[in-house]
Regions:
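Short acidic/polar hinge/loop motifs at secondary-structure boundaries
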Residues: 59-62, 185-222
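Extracytoplasmic beta-strand/coil segments of soluble accessory domains associated
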Residues: 60-62, 140-189, 217, 227-244
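Short, glycine-/polar-rich solvent-exposed loops and beta-turns at beta-strand/coil boundaries
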Residues: 55, 83-88, 152-160, 212, ...
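Extracellular/periplasmic, surface-exposed regions of secreted and cell-surface proteins
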Residues: 130, 177, 342, 377, ...
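Residues embedded in well-ordered regular secondary structure
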Residues: 145, 157-162, 172-179, 187-204, ...
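N-terminal periplasmic "start-of-domain" segments of outer-membrane beta-barrel proteins
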Residues: 41-58, 106-131, 159-163, 191-201, ...
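Short, polar/charged loop or turn motifs at beta-strand boundaries
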Residues: 28-31, 121-144, 152-156, 165-171, ...
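Periplasm-facing N-terminal accessory domains of Gram-negative outer-membrane beta-barrel systems
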Residues: 7, 14-104
Length: 826
């Protein structure tokens, strides 16, 4: 009887629950052609339940009692909210295309265009995607997101340098970094000042001065049809960064705070003091036995008299470290620590028909996992524009950044902290200052360096981009851009008497160095945009550009300080100040450029560009060079026979060819470097000038590196662009590489900068994206990319090695048929 009652109660409850919800069914179709919208989302507003349309566009959703609003969404279509009528169980929906999404605007060089009209290989990342991982710098936000773009962090320290390569390395000795353009203006930095010590390879990240929260979008230009408009600086690709403007509607105030913790996930297993002493003793015994040597046992566990003092001195043995009589040190525990980071962002923005404004501030404090390392940044940005008349608009975008980077000695050839944590003997005392236990000059006490070494980099950066834009009539715009940037880096270094650099007889080592750079850009640009008879669209850009860069540096090194308390703050106290050094230089670049985009029937797309650059870096006869490109694309998905297949929602084929250049050499590489020198004449010494022999002789025949690139690609979209796939195949060859060649020393020199050698890169890039759920409050998508690049050297007269012993790169072999970075061993 009891079981029967429970059964009846469960049956009644089941019927009551079914009565509390209604099953609504229907079909979701395209408003234009009536095709089913596969994968369209249906959500019950306020209930958290929903459904997805099947291959026929049909859906079925349970609507709880009291809920009567359904929300329909699909990629590429406008979202709809529909209220159910009382008792309604069938609801068929037609959805209209979201033209704003379909006509997504992508920034390209010297302009912008609809994504559907692109003929080149361009990848765009929006702010919401960039900020998903809360990156500290822009470079970190790009890691792993774009096919063919390799982001490597040179050093794991906060604020350390990050290198970006697009479609492989093009050169041996010149920079392989892409050109960075911020709001239409080239972004430059003066780099890291030196310390006067070889082997200290710490690097700084210039893009870390830009707050990622200020970014609206980033476009990566990869093929030559997209980069040729930048001529002599586009060979390594171009990264276009657009900062945020004011959002439409009411004034918007936003604040965010982010906190994080970093720590070493897994430390390496190291020998303790007992095991280390045992192995050292065994090594000495084997050496004596098999090499007939007479080496003393390093850990004998015996006493002997010190002849200098007459006292008995005990040398510990392995057992002394096992029983704790003598401490055993794991240097990783002494060097690494848990690091904390905090970041605060405040922004105010707004816009109307008359203009826009966006003002933001950022504070970042990131400590490193190595003791006494970290990075602090304070930044401010103001982006303002105003229409002072219907046909004239003015605006400016200004930013200022102050940062402090406390550098640990983590990327150093000698005496590095990480190296010391792995190689310094576990038997050495924690505060060992004698360095008697130093294995070799590559390894020193890491604990001492985290407490007794100072290396700080202070950076102040100002960047502005201002414009005046005039619209004489509907289809023509004339724009004047003025860009200015100023950067100064100051580096303060002090190694006290506990370190290898500062120990007796050096008695403290101090270095103070700074460098600065300022860059002025003037651009006059005219843009003509016209549509004829609906089937013909033409966009033409013509521009003149002038850029001037000034830079300078100075440095001072001193040793022999009476004490360590004042560190580098009192350089006059040093007994042995070295001769100060300084430098100054200037470069200029003049350019004429143009580009034309033609769209026929929204199916056939054509692009052509041309740029003529003149650089002060080269000698007369080689100052000017031309760079051109062309591209075509076919939007096959607009053809009726493709539409009839009912397979592709987007299908576009692309092909391009173009040439770009590289002028990344010194400002005066084609000129003689002179220094004051004395020379004998008529039996007496006379003062004059002589060549700096280590610089090499002048080479007036130097010319640009030239990169020629072919690219073919296809863009595909399925199920109303819910699934997107992009495939690119490329081949590029860089010729006339700028590098040093050895010359007979009878000339008075040992090497000379010249053009020789080639590098080819060929590869495949595949990018896919799947929109699983799209809605007003919930979005779920998947991204994936993979790329393959093959790099090969050719045109060398013989084998050679990478230059720069202090960088420890002389193990890299450069041989015809082999890739850049080939390591030569024994």
């Amino acid at each position: 009887m009891k079981n029967m009652m429970l059964f009846l109660m469960a049956l009644l409850m089941s019927g009551h629950m079914m009565a509390q919800q209604t099953i609504v069914t229907g079909v979701i179709t395209d408003a234009n052609d009536g095709s089913p919208l596969i994968g369209a989302n249906v959500l019950v507003k306020g209930a958290g339940t929903g459904s997805i349309a099947n291959v026929d566009g049909k859906y079925s959703v349970n609507v709880p009692n009291g809920k009567n609003v359904l929300v329909f969404s699909c990629v590429g279509y406008k979202e709809q909210e529909i209220t159910l009528k009382p008792g309604q169980k069938v609801l068929n929906v037609t959805m209209k295309e979201d033209t704003e999404l379909l006509d997504e605007v992508v920034v390209i060089g010297y302009g912008s265009m609809k994504k559907s009209d692109l003929t080149g290989s361009v990848t765009s990342i929006k702010s919401e995607d960039l900020m998903k991982t809360n990156p500290i710098s822009i470079n970190q936000g790009l890691q792993g997101r774009i096919a063919g773009v390799q982001v490597n962090q040179n050093d794991g320290a906060p604020g350390a340098g990050v290198s970006i390569q697009i479609r492989g390395a093009n050169s041996f000795s010149t920079s392989t970094e892409p050109l960075y353009i911020v709001d239409g203006i080239p972004f430059t930095s003066s780099g890291m000042p030196g310390t006067g010590k070889d082997g200290m390879m710490q690097t700084a990240n210039p893009l870390s001065t830009i707050n990622p929260s200020d970014i609206e979008s980033i476009e990566i230009l990869k093929d030559a049809s997209a980069t040729a408009i930048y001529g002599s600086r586009g060979a390594n690709g171009v990264v276009l960064i657009t900062t945020k403007r004011g959002a439409k509607g009411k004034d918007n105030i936003s604040f965010s705070a982010n906190f994080g913790i970093s720590k070493v996930v897994k430390k390496l297993d190291m020998l303790d003091g007992y095991a280390y002493a045992m192995y050292r003793n065994e090594a000495a015994q084997m050496f004596n036995e098999y090499e007939n040597a007479n080496e003393a046992i390093p850990y004998p566990g015996t006493s002997k008299v010190d002849p200098s003092t007459g006292e008995s001195v005990y040398s510990p043995g392995p057992e002394d470290y096992r029983n704790g009589t003598y401490p055993s040190v794991n240097w990783q525990d002494e060097v690494f620590e848990t690091a904390f980071s905090q970041e605060y962002n405040l922004s105010v923005n707004g816009s109307n028909d008359k203009g826009y404004y966006a003002i933001s501030g950022n504070i970042l404090d990131q400590s490193g996992i190595i003791h006494n390392s970290g990075y602090k940044r304070y930044s401010f940005r103001a982006n303002l524009a105003r229409k002072v008349h219907e046909w004239i608009e003015i605006g400016t975008n200004m930013s200022f950044t102050n940062s402090l980077n406390k550098l640990a000695k983590t990327n150093s050839v000698s005496d590095g902290i990480i190296r010391g944590a792995l190689f310094y003997p576990a038997t050495a005392p924690l505060d060992d200052e004698t360095n008697n236990a130093q294995l070799n000059w590559f390894s020193s006490n890491p604990y001492v360096y985290t407490r007794a070494a100072k290396d700080e980099l202070t950076t102040n950066s100002f960047f502005s981009s201002s414009f005046v834009e005039i619209t004489p009539y509907k289809d023509l715009k004339v724009r004047q851009n003025v860009g200015f940037s100023y950067n100064i880096n100051e580096r303060d270094v002090y190694y006290n008497r506990e370190t290898v650099e500062g120990k007796d007889p050096t008695n403290g080592y101090a270095s103070k160095a700074d460098n600065w750079s300022k860059n002025l850009v003037l651009e006059t640009m005219a843009t003509y945009n016209k549509t004829f008879n609906r089937n013909h669209s033409l966009n033409v850009v013509a521009a003149f550009s002038y850029e001037r860069g000034d830079y300078g540096n100075k440095a001072m090194v001193a040793t022999g300080f009476p004490q360590d308390l004042t560190e580098d703050f009192d350089m006059s106290a040093a007994v042995n100040p070295q001769k100060p050094t300084s430098g100054r230089g200037m470069t200029s670049l003049v350019s004429f450029l143009g580009r034309a985009n033609y769209n026929l029937m929204n199916k056939y797309l054509f692009t052509a560009s041309f740029r003529r650059d003149g650089s002060s870096k080269f000698a007369p006869g080689n100052k000017w060079s031309n760079f051109a490109s062309g591209a075509i694309a076919w939007r096959a998905s607009e053809e009726q026979f493709i539409k009839d297949l009912n397979v592709f929602s987007n299908l576009k084929f692309r092909a391009s060819y173009g040439q770009t250049g590289n002028q990344a050499i010194g400002a005066y590489a084609t000129r003689d470097y002179l220094t004051v020198a004395n020379y004998p004449i008529n039996g007496a010494l006379a003062s004059g000038f002589a060549n700096l022999t280590w610089r090499g002789p002048a080479n007036p025949d130097l010319k640009w590196e030239t990169t020629s690139q072919y690219n073919v690609g296809v863009d595909m979209g399925f199920f109303q662009n819910r699934i997107n796939l992009t495939i690119d195949l490329y081949y590029k060859k860089t010729s006339d590489l700028l590098q040093n060649i050895q010359i007979p020393q009878s000339t008075g020199f040992s090497n000379m900068t010249t053009n020789f050698g080639n590098v080819t890169n060929k590869g495949l890039e595949i990018t896919g994206k799947f929109y699983a759920i799209t809605g007003k409050n919930l979005n779920w998508d998947f991204d994936a990319n993979i790329s393959f690049n093959r790099n090969k050297i050719s045109g060398l007269p013989g084998d050679q090695f990478a230059q720069g012993w202090s960088k420890a790169d002389n193990v890299f072999l450069q041989r015809n048929g082999m890739p850049i970075g080939t390591i030569y061993g024994f």
